[in-house]
């Protein structure tokens, strides 16, 4: 029985010892597990911190690189903008200079063209004015000449009729006188015919002078002797070819042309000459 108790006590002691050992082992395991957990947690924290530090460093490096790159880009863009702005400014100045030169050239051309036009217009106006003045002078000369000829035409015609009548009456008187003296008798023929011939000769010369005066063939002295009212005028005219010529006409009180009565005077002169020939 004693041995059973001893065995029971020994077993109880062993059980307690085992229990204590198990508790101690459990406690140690718990502590070891706790230490492991702490170590793992510490390692994780360290790793996390290392990762955070590395990420922070990486972020800082990336940010610095980005900042540097951005600054480089900004610097390059600023330089590019400045270069482009300088090029645009240079191009704009060149365009403005070219436009100014073009404007000056165009203005100078317009001024030259305007001056040429004004000079041409002035010359044209002067030429037109000179032509108009010449035309007016020619018209005035023509009007004066036409009026003068119109006024003198009737006087010329009247003078021609008077001269023709004078020549006709002179010839008739000579014929009548010759006829009357021829009937006076044959015994007085010699002396009478001599006187008659002289008288007829004088009348014929008077008729001839009248005809010469009519034709404008008499001299100025003869005109003044037989026709005291006779004057001599000189007319000057200019033809279209600018050749100037003078025409001298002897008139009795006015200008006339002999063509109006040329035929009658010639007939009267022939009649007088025939009578003189018969008497002589």
Swiss-Prot record:
Induction of synthesis: By abscisic acid (ABA).
Compositionally biased tracts (Low complexity): 40-114, 230-239
Record keywords: Repeat
Region ranges (Disordered): 1-156, 220-241
Record's compositionally biased regions (Basic and acidic residues): 28-39, 115-127, 136-145
LEA 11-mer repeat repeats: 31-41, 53-63, 75-85, 97-107, 119-129
Family: Belongs to the LEA type 4 family.
Free-text function comment from the UniProt entry: Lea proteins are late embryonic proteins abundant in higher plant seed embryos.
Name recorded for this polypeptide: Late embryogenesis abundant protein 76
Organism in which the protein naturally occurs: Brassica napus
Lineage: Eukaryota, Viridiplantae, Streptophyta, Embryophyta, Tracheophyta
């Amino acid at each position: 029985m004693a041995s059973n108790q001893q065995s029971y006590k020994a077993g109880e002691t062993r059980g307690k010892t085992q229990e204590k050992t198990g508790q101690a082992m459990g406690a140690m395991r718990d502590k070891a597990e706790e230490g492991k957990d702490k170590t793992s947690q510490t390692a994780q924290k360290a790793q996390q911190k290392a990762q955070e530090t590395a990420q922070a460093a990486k972020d800082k490096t990336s940010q610095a690189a980005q900042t540097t790159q951005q600054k480089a880009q900004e610097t390059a863009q600023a330089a590019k903008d400045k270069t482009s702005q300088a090029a645009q400014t240079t191009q704009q100045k060149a365009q403005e200079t070219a436009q100014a030169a073009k404007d000056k050239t165009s203005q100078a051309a317009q001024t030259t063209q305007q001056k040429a036009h004004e000079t041409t217009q002035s010359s044209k106006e002067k030429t037109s004015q000179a032509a108009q003045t010449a035309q007016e002078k020619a018209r005035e000369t023509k009007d004066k000449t036409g009026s003068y000829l119109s006024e003198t035409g009737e006087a010329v015609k009247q003078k021609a009729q008077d001269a023709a009548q004078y020549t006709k009456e002179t010839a008739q008187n000579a014929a009548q006188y010759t006829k009357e003296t021829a009937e006076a008798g044959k015994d007085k023929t010699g002396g009478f015919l001599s006187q008659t011939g002289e008288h007829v000769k004088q009348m014929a010369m008077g008729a001839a002078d009248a005809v010469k005066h009519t034709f404008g063939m008499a001299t100025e002295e003869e005109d003044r002797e037989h026709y005291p009212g006779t004057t001599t005028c000189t007319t000057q005219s200019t033809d279209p070819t600018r050749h100037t010529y003078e025409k001298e006409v002897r008139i009795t009180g006015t200008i006339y042309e002999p063509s109006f009565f040329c035929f009658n005077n010639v007939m009267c002169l022939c009649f007088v000459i025939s009578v003189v020939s018969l008497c002589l």
